[in-house]
């Protein structure tokens, strides 16, 4: 029997990011904004680097160029250069985390401290999403991510002139 769980505020960190740590094969992340998010006491990118060292495939689609702190964290982990696949798409506004093609988060939270509930209660964003292993919802999330990943919409994109790194 599949499950669908409502996730809000700090539970993004407690329930969603805790699952990323347990990834065995693949983690696909889609976010509009990405910043120097921390998991426990380490940068999220350190977690991604450790997953890559275990042979996990990591794909990241984001809309904005990351900030300086994120880029500095990226520099500390050389495996991220060739190991983490990354695509920039200005039109991405979805927030998806798909783990091992068996569970998906779909919601409003960007991959930032405020979005994922890491900030204090007075500073974090009010976010909402669902966590599910429902086959129909999972397949829809995978298909949407994959269509952007392969550049299905690039040819006719009305923002192509602003795209610094077109997929196709």
Task: Locate the predicted segments by residue.
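Signature of lipid phosphatidyltransferase scaffolds
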Residues: 105-168
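Short solvent-exposed loop/turn micro-motifs enriched in small/polar/acidic residues
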Residues: 87-91, 123
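Acidic/glycine-enriched edge-of-secondary-structure segments
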Residues: 1-10, 31-35
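Short beta-strand scaffold segments in enzyme catalytic cores
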Residues: 95-98, 128-130
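A conditional alpha-helix N-cap/helix-loop micro-motif detector
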Residues: 9-10, 40-41, 86
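Primarily the HKD phosphodiesterase
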Residues: 13-81
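Glycine-centered positions within short beta-strands or beta-hairpins
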Residues: 101-102
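Short beta-alpha junction loops
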Residues: 62-68, 92, 135-137
